[in-house]
């Protein structure tokens, strides 16, 4: 297999995108929900030194001066904490003391001493901007007071541990870096938690008890509950309600990751030819993402040729592509923990067959109409799914793929069997973002959702004409809800038939 020729590939991509990947650089991002208060900004500063994560001093090519993480200030993280504390106290009881415990993720290992790439707990990161494992955010709001205290438990500096695993921030710098009231070693948390809970009553302990981010912390919290007089409540519903509506800084971060993902899918198209493997196409996508500024993929990609595309979560990606195949890719990338999620389908030969073109344009028409509906009606995502089933059934019937002698309800049911997955989910720090926010509420400004209709016809599906069998097609874009028409964040990823045919196979791998 020949080495990927990036120089010739650039000219291919330039024809179909707003900007060239080779010239792409991270933008310096806005970070405020509203005009900043100069007096509040003066309270914050990023200390100089080598810490447990990049800073604007050590990585100015990634983080603008004054920001804690890419595009987001200390002030914004603090405002998020203030909002959460206020929401929780109002929801339960203002006359009780409220204790909030949000643990960071801990390192995970695939085998002895071999770690997985660390991925921070999204809720913890959203509130702190801290990227260190096994830390703990502790907040306490005394009864009948407007103030609250924030304590961050982190690993203390340790020269031996840092020799092996890299720098730690330590307690001394953590207070300033993360703009918290106090920082303590994680080893103190057990005794601190027991003392705090046992000395307070009545107290509401806010902690996510299901699928804990850190089992060690989970055990401490559970044991402290037995000793004290606390009632247990889950903060995650309130956190997800906050997270589902993106700040201006988050919108910019999502634009970046969606742009990178879009260009990487374009490049995967350009490298597709009969005879190469699904794995090779997957590798081109991942390589382009990383070279363009993403840390890694958002999830294991689906790269499914031919009838394998009828298996919705096919991730083996180990078969060779045939000339007559359609290729479905469902992939995304992660940049500063924010995710893109894109699906495209194209002919391996670079030319749609007549029957493949009918199916593809049918799915594309459904997707375009659903995006229009998001702007016109702002429906709940569950209602958008109902629209998809109705439109898909109607269009399939018009093309003669489904019979004309069935009523509307049966038609919707047949469409659902051909596309059994939901048409949309929220997107952000997690691919399936804010899962506790129901999909039956209307969408609002600054939500980001996917729109991903598909059709999957197995090779042995005798209910459709033979020429349409053994094909899976999905088209997915990431969409920002605005006052006007929804903004498609993945609009540089080609999806029109003519554009696809112009780009597929134009680069050797």
Mark where each language-model region is.
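Active-site neighborhoods and metal-handling regions in enzymes and metal-associated proteins
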Residues: 2-9, 13-509
